[in-house]
Swiss-Prot record:
This is FMN reductase (NADH) RutF. Keywords: Flavoprotein, FMN, NAD, Oxidoreductase. It comes from the Bacteria. It catalyses: FMNH2 + NAD(+) = FMN + NADH + 2 H(+). The lineage of its organism: Bacteria, Pseudomonadati, Pseudomonadota, Alphaproteobacteria, Hyphomicrobiales. One of its GO terms (biological process) is uracil catabolic process. Gene3D superfamilies: Electron Transport, Fmn-binding Protein, Chain A. Belongs to the non-flavoprotein flavin reductase family. RutF subfamily. GO terms for molecular function: FMN binding; FMN reductase (NADH) activity; FMN reductase [NAD(P)H] activity; riboflavin reductase (NADPH) activity. It is an enzyme of class 1 (oxidoreductase).
Length: 205
Protein backbone atom coordinates (compact mmCIF):
# COMPACT_ATOMS: atom_id res chain seq x y z
CA UNK A 1 0.00 0.00 0.00
CA UNK A 2 1.40 3.40 -0.93
CA UNK A 3 1.67 6.36 1.43
CA UNK A 4 -1.01 8.13 -0.61
CA UNK A 5 -3.45 5.26 -0.17
CA UNK A 6 -2.77 5.18 3.58
CA UNK A 7 -3.50 8.91 3.92
CA UNK A 8 -6.72 8.60 1.92
CA UNK A 9 -7.95 5.75 4.10
CA UNK A 10 -7.15 7.73 7.25
CA UNK A 11 -8.98 10.81 5.94
CA UNK A 12 -12.13 8.74 5.46
CA UNK A 13 -12.44 8.09 9.21
CA UNK A 14 -15.12 10.42 10.66
CA UNK A 15 -13.78 13.12 12.97
CA UNK A 16 -15.06 12.78 16.52
CA UNK A 17 -17.42 15.67 17.38
CA UNK A 18 -15.76 16.31 20.76
CA UNK A 19 -12.32 16.40 19.15
CA UNK A 20 -13.62 18.81 16.52
CA UNK A 21 -15.08 21.15 19.18
CA UNK A 22 -11.81 21.06 21.11
CA UNK A 23 -9.86 21.92 17.97
CA UNK A 24 -12.26 24.77 17.14
CA UNK A 25 -11.87 26.18 20.66
CA UNK A 26 -8.29 27.07 19.74
CA UNK A 27 -9.38 29.43 16.99
CA UNK A 28 -9.42 33.03 18.17
CA UNK A 29 -12.62 34.69 16.94
CA UNK A 30 -14.27 38.08 17.23
CA UNK A 31 -17.34 38.15 19.48
CA UNK A 32 -20.69 39.50 18.25
CA UNK A 33 -24.22 39.94 19.51
CA UNK A 34 -26.77 39.00 16.85
CA UNK A 35 -30.00 40.88 17.60
CA UNK A 36 -33.42 41.12 15.96
CA UNK A 37 -36.84 42.62 16.58
CA UNK A 38 -40.07 42.58 14.62
CA UNK A 39 -43.22 40.48 14.12
CA UNK A 40 -41.39 37.41 15.44
CA UNK A 41 -40.39 39.19 18.63
CA UNK A 42 -37.16 40.51 20.09
CA UNK A 43 -34.25 38.09 20.48
CA UNK A 44 -30.49 37.85 20.43
CA UNK A 45 -27.55 35.54 20.93
CA UNK A 46 -23.76 35.64 21.15
CA UNK A 47 -21.91 34.42 18.06
CA UNK A 48 -18.39 33.96 16.81
CA UNK A 49 -19.40 32.24 13.55
CA UNK A 50 -19.65 35.48 11.55
CA UNK A 51 -17.60 36.43 8.50
CA UNK A 52 -17.62 38.56 5.38
CA UNK A 53 -18.86 37.00 2.14
CA UNK A 54 -18.50 39.91 -0.28
CA UNK A 55 -18.08 43.68 -0.40
CA UNK A 56 -20.02 44.02 -3.66
CA UNK A 57 -22.71 43.81 -2.53
CA UNK A 58 -21.72 43.96 1.16
CA UNK A 59 -22.77 40.60 2.61
CA UNK A 60 -22.12 38.83 5.90
CA UNK A 61 -22.49 35.18 6.83
CA UNK A 62 -24.00 34.33 10.23
CA UNK A 63 -24.45 30.80 11.60
CA UNK A 64 -27.19 29.92 14.10
CA UNK A 65 -28.12 26.64 15.76
CA UNK A 66 -31.72 25.74 14.92
CA UNK A 67 -32.18 24.84 18.61
CA UNK A 68 -31.34 28.43 19.62
CA UNK A 69 -34.04 30.37 21.46
CA UNK A 70 -33.47 33.19 18.95
CA UNK A 71 -33.98 31.04 15.85
CA UNK A 72 -37.74 31.47 15.39
CA UNK A 73 -37.71 35.25 15.88
CA UNK A 74 -34.68 35.72 13.66
CA UNK A 75 -36.04 33.75 10.74
CA UNK A 76 -39.53 35.23 11.02
CA UNK A 77 -38.29 38.82 11.23
CA UNK A 78 -35.89 38.37 8.33
CA UNK A 79 -33.60 41.10 9.66
CA UNK A 80 -30.78 41.26 12.18
CA UNK A 81 -27.98 43.40 13.53
CA UNK A 82 -24.43 42.13 13.96
CA UNK A 83 -22.94 44.02 16.95
CA UNK A 84 -19.18 43.51 17.20
CA UNK A 85 -18.04 43.65 20.83
CA UNK A 86 -15.04 45.18 22.55
CA UNK A 87 -13.30 45.09 25.90
CA UNK A 88 -15.81 45.66 28.70
CA UNK A 89 -18.57 43.72 26.94
CA UNK A 90 -17.75 40.39 28.61
CA UNK A 91 -20.84 40.49 30.84
CA UNK A 92 -23.35 41.20 28.06
CA UNK A 93 -21.65 38.58 25.87
CA UNK A 94 -22.09 35.97 28.61
CA UNK A 95 -25.74 36.93 29.16
CA UNK A 96 -26.59 36.59 25.47
CA UNK A 97 -24.64 33.34 25.31
CA UNK A 98 -26.56 31.54 28.06
CA UNK A 99 -30.13 30.79 29.05
CA UNK A 100 -30.82 34.26 30.44
CA UNK A 101 -34.38 35.54 29.72
CA UNK A 102 -34.61 37.93 26.79
CA UNK A 103 -35.55 40.98 28.88
CA UNK A 104 -32.54 40.47 31.15
CA UNK A 105 -30.22 40.16 28.17
CA UNK A 106 -31.28 43.48 26.71
CA UNK A 107 -31.33 45.18 30.13
CA UNK A 108 -27.54 44.74 30.25
CA UNK A 109 -26.91 47.24 27.46
CA UNK A 110 -28.08 50.51 25.91
CA UNK A 111 -29.74 50.13 22.54
CA UNK A 112 -31.01 52.12 19.58
CA UNK A 113 -33.35 50.93 16.87
CA UNK A 114 -32.00 50.61 13.34
CA UNK A 115 -34.03 51.13 10.13
CA UNK A 116 -34.59 47.36 9.94
CA UNK A 117 -36.08 47.40 13.44
CA UNK A 118 -33.16 45.45 14.90
CA UNK A 119 -31.61 46.72 18.16
CA UNK A 120 -28.03 48.02 17.94
CA UNK A 121 -25.77 48.17 20.99
CA UNK A 122 -24.82 51.84 21.23
CA UNK A 123 -21.21 51.23 22.27
CA UNK A 124 -20.48 48.27 19.98
CA UNK A 125 -17.26 48.60 18.01
CA UNK A 126 -19.39 48.42 14.87
CA UNK A 127 -22.99 47.49 14.07
CA UNK A 128 -24.14 46.02 10.75
CA UNK A 129 -27.84 46.40 9.95
CA UNK A 130 -28.75 43.41 7.79
CA UNK A 131 -31.52 41.75 5.82
CA UNK A 132 -31.44 37.96 5.49
CA UNK A 133 -31.32 37.16 1.77
CA UNK A 134 -30.45 33.46 1.85
CA UNK A 135 -30.39 30.47 4.16
CA UNK A 136 -28.77 27.05 3.93
CA UNK A 137 -29.07 24.19 6.43
CA UNK A 138 -25.88 22.34 7.39
CA UNK A 139 -26.08 19.77 10.17
CA UNK A 140 -27.49 21.38 13.33
CA UNK A 141 -27.11 24.94 12.03
CA UNK A 142 -28.48 27.32 9.44
CA UNK A 143 -26.04 29.47 7.49
CA UNK A 144 -27.63 32.88 6.96
CA UNK A 145 -26.53 35.17 4.14
CA UNK A 146 -27.15 38.74 5.24
CA UNK A 147 -27.16 41.81 2.98
CA UNK A 148 -25.64 44.75 4.87
CA UNK A 149 -27.90 47.78 4.49
CA UNK A 150 -26.20 50.15 6.95
CA UNK A 151 -23.02 50.30 9.03
CA UNK A 152 -22.36 52.29 12.20
CA UNK A 153 -18.92 52.34 13.85
CA UNK A 154 -18.92 54.04 17.24
CA UNK A 155 -17.00 52.08 19.88
CA UNK A 156 -13.33 52.82 20.61
CA UNK A 157 -12.48 49.88 22.88
CA UNK A 158 -10.00 47.12 22.15
CA UNK A 159 -11.48 44.16 20.29
CA UNK A 160 -13.01 41.29 22.28
CA UNK A 161 -11.94 37.81 21.21
CA UNK A 162 -12.97 34.30 22.27
CA UNK A 163 -10.32 31.60 22.35
CA UNK A 164 -9.86 28.41 24.39
CA UNK A 165 -13.27 29.07 25.98
CA UNK A 166 -12.13 32.40 27.41
CA UNK A 167 -12.60 36.04 26.54
CA UNK A 168 -9.45 37.91 25.60
CA UNK A 169 -8.75 41.38 24.25
CA UNK A 170 -6.72 42.54 21.28
CA UNK A 171 -5.30 46.08 21.51
CA UNK A 172 -6.09 48.41 18.66
CA UNK A 173 -3.21 48.94 16.28
CA UNK A 174 -1.37 52.21 17.07
CA UNK A 175 -1.85 54.99 14.58
CA UNK A 176 1.12 56.04 12.48
CA UNK A 177 3.65 57.88 14.64
CA UNK A 178 2.14 56.79 17.96
CA UNK A 179 3.90 54.71 20.58
CA UNK A 180 3.27 50.94 20.64
CA UNK A 181 1.15 49.38 23.39
CA UNK A 182 2.96 49.05 26.72
CA UNK A 183 4.28 45.52 27.50
CA UNK A 184 1.84 44.87 30.36
CA UNK A 185 -1.14 45.71 28.16
CA UNK A 186 0.11 43.52 25.34
CA UNK A 187 0.59 40.63 27.76
CA UNK A 188 -2.97 40.99 29.04
CA UNK A 189 -4.27 40.88 25.50
CA UNK A 190 -2.55 37.55 24.93
CA UNK A 191 -3.79 36.09 28.18
CA UNK A 192 -0.20 35.98 29.42
CA UNK A 193 1.37 37.19 32.67
CA UNK A 194 2.45 40.85 32.45
CA UNK A 195 6.04 41.76 33.28
CA UNK A 196 4.84 43.27 36.57
CA UNK A 197 1.73 42.61 38.61
CA UNK A 198 -0.68 39.66 38.71
CA UNK A 199 -1.96 37.82 35.68
CA UNK A 200 -5.33 38.93 34.32
CA UNK A 201 -8.13 36.56 35.27
CA UNK A 202 -9.97 35.72 32.07
CA UNK A 203 -13.54 34.59 32.58
CA UNK A 204 -15.02 31.70 30.66
CA UNK A 205 -18.37 32.12 28.91
Amino acid sequence: MTAFETESESAAVPVDAAAYREAMSRLASAVHLITTDGPGGRAGFTASAVCSVSDAPPTLLVCINRASSAYAALTQNGTLCVNTLGEGHETVASLFGGRTPVDERFAAGTWRRLPSGAPALTDALVSFDCRIVGRHAVGSHDVLYCAVEAVAASGQADALLYSERRYRTLPRAPRSGSAPAEPARAARALGARPAEGPALALRSA
